[in-house]
Amino acid sequence: MSRIERIQAKLSVLKPYFQEIIDESYKHTSHYDGIHSHIKIRISAKILQGKSLIANHRTINNLLIDEFNNGLHALSIEVL
């Protein structure tokens, strides 16, 4: 299972209406050489609505802690 697939599976607990996971690693090859190391997430889920930006980022980052411990270098999150 690829990192993208693992992230999709982990985010599924939020029951998103919409989720898009974009690998932006190609933009960062000059300073970081990793496969699926820079990820952008665009997501809409009822559980995230009405919460602060920090609360949403904490929720998502906590779901992905294993990915950060295994090579995920940067995560951009956009809650829609």
Model regions and ranges:
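N-terminal, polar/charged subdomain of small-to-medium soluble alpha/beta proteins
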Residues: 1-80
